[in-house]
Amino acid sequence: MPDVGIIYNDSKPRACTIAEELQQQLQDRGWGVRLATSQSGLLGYSNPDTVICHTPVESLVPRGFDASLRWAIVLGGDGTVLAAARQLAPIGVPMLTVNTGHLGFLAEAYLDSLPAAIEQLCKGEYSIEERTMMEVKVLRRELIRWEALSLNEMALHREPLTSMCHFEVAIGKHVPVDIAADGVIVSTPTGSTAYSLSSGGPVVTPDVPVFQLVPICPHSLASRALVFANREPMTIFPATPERLMMVVDGNAGCYVWPEDRVLIQRSRYPAQFIRLQPNEFFRVLREKLGWGLPHVAKPSAPDQS
């Protein structure tokens, strides 16, 4: 049998225990198992007083993992899934996401259904859903200073105790637009239910080939979220004298200076999710975020008597 992988959050004892148990179970079935933590997918934050260390996205693949793996099981919460997507997308390995955290918005399976999920996985009774990822680069002239893959979003915003920011945003060859706000978010359809949603952006179904630009606390009544085709690159030029903070998927980032620019484009590496049942996005929205729930009782009109 071909080899498979297990990626787990080693900061969670429960995930560590399950990873060891799964490794033994799969080996007993005749599978070769390669084990890795999600740590290499967590890029961390650059210190403003040190030189940024440019890490190519392909270098985040765990040691021993390659394109020959049939699939990988990811054990952890949504943060672990975001990290694992960066680790597995460059080698095209699909992942079964198993929630050991809290919300588990990106989870396909849960611990109570794990034995049945493994049985189905080993029999090959699953489908694969591709999710678009963004490639985010910080450039100074033509030099790449920092880059990362993003499954959810990139947020570029001011530091605490600094004033409002100004950005010049160019999409493809269109005329650039100016935005005055505390920051901007660029998200994928997958990320439309995360930070972007909290900032007033729309929910986008995962199969739509778009990105969205969402201003954070804009200083304009006319500044609204913009949805645009992901075939066009976006470049963000800081138009403010202070340095800015960039955060990718909530767990990686660096400082962006006035002389830098941020280039965002669709990655050639999609994240591949294993689906054990037909994916019903609206069901997930309803169960996880309470979207579209029926009103149990409507407020009554005031008594006019």
UniProtKB/Swiss-Prot annotation:
NAD(+) binds at D78, G79, N152, E153, D182, T193, A194, Y195, S196, L197, S198, N251. It is found in: Cytoplasm. Keywords: ATP-binding, Cytoplasm, Kinase, NAD, NADP, Nucleotide-binding, Transferase. It is an enzyme of class 2 (transferase). Its EC number is 2.7.1.23. InterPro entries: ATP-NAD_kinase_N, ATP-NAD_kinase_PpnK-typ_C, NAD/diacylglycerol_kinase_sf, NADK. Involved in the regulation of the intracellular balance of NAD and NADP, and is a key enzyme in the biosynthesis of NADP. Catalyzes specifically the phosphorylation on 2'-hydroxyl of the adenosine moiety of NAD to yield NADP. This is NAD kinase 2. It comes from Synechococcus sp. (strain ATCC 27144 / PCC 6301 / SAUG 1402/1). The gene is nadK2.
